């Protein structure tokens, strides 16, 4: 059933929707048009790369804390693309990836990166909380990194533990 809606005349990011009594869930579809040039804003998508910032592509009800809004996010990727995200519980069926339900607060803190040219490097595979570097590039050749470059990233892991005194994560992508 189509619901009538109107953009708020003052708060440009707010919408007013007439929701019938008793409705517990809405299924919403809309298109997000990303900047294609830095003069228009932050470019987050090219023909071969995607940096999906969930907060730019979602609608949620006003009057609730983000940590109290459960979200089951899904994304449809172009054929042959791979992805990486801090979101867990990903199930892929064809080109559609469905993630486990998380609070909205977690979703917006877990961007998704995707593209056809992808490489994952284990920076610290320890059981104390593995740390991985996910690399996406415009071409396969750009995925290459020297041992010296990767060693710098590996050292940052140890330096962060020394600085903060512990690992405040189960795993880090």
List the predicted regions and their residue ranges.
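Non-catalytic architectural context of zinc metalloproteases
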Residues: 1-156, 162-170
């Amino acid at each position: 059933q189509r619901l009538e809606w109107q953009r708020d005349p003052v708060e440009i990011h707010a919408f007013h929707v007439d929701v019938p009594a008793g409705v517990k869930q809405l299924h919403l579809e809309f298109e997000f048009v990303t900047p294609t040039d830095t003069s228009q804003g932050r470019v987050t998508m090219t023909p071969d790369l995607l940096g999906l910032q969930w907060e730019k592509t979602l609608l949620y009800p006003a009057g609730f804390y983000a940590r109290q809004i459960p979200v089951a996010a899904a994304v449809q990727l172009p054929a042959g693309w791979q992805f990486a995200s801090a979101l867990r519980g990903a199930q892929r069926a064809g080109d559609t990836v469905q993630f486990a339900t998380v609070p909205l607060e977690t979703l917006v803190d877990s961007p998704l990166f995707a593209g056809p040219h992808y490489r994952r490097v284990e920076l610290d595979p320890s059981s104390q909380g593995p740390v991985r570097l996910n690399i996406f590039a415009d071409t396969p050749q750009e995925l290459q990194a020297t041992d010296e470059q990767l060693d710098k990233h590996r050292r940052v892991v140890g330096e962060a533990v020394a600085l903060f005194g512990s690992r405040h994560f189960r795993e880090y992508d």
